[in-house]
């Protein structure tokens, strides 16, 4: 049985949230008060989603911060 490659939370952020909502990485970074580089690195899969970022994303998108932490945990464990 072939394993499916894990998806980094940054890809989900980009494809399921930013693109469909028409939000730029820069706009998100400014709105949640983090450096734009942080969002860019998350989207490109070179930075993990920290608890702090999960809280900010959760508040911004009106979903549980646990959603983001779970995505990161699943990616890390794959």
For the regions a protein language model found, what residue spans apply to each?
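Alpha-helical DNA-recognition elements
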Residues: 41, 45, 74
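A short, Lys/Arg-rich alpha-helix, primarily the initiator
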Residues: 1-23, 70
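Short, basic-rich loop-to-helix N-cap that marks the start of a DNA-contacting helix
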Residues: 46-59
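Short alpha-helical DNA-recognition segment
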Residues: 23-41
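Short, charged recognition helix plus adjacent turn
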Residues: 67-78
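Residues within the alpha-helical elements of helix-turn-helix
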Residues: 20, 31, 60
């Amino acid at each position: 049985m072939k394993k499916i490659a894990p998806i980094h939370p940054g890809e989900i952020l980009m494809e399921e949230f930013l693109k469909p909502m028409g939000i730029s990485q820069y706009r998100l970074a400014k709105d949640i008060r983090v450096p734009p580089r942080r969002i860019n690195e998350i989207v490109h899969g070179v930075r993990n989603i920290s608890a702090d970022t999960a809280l900010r994303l959760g508040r911004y998108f009106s979903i549980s911060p646990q959603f983001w932490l779970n995505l990161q945990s699943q990616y890390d464990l794959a």
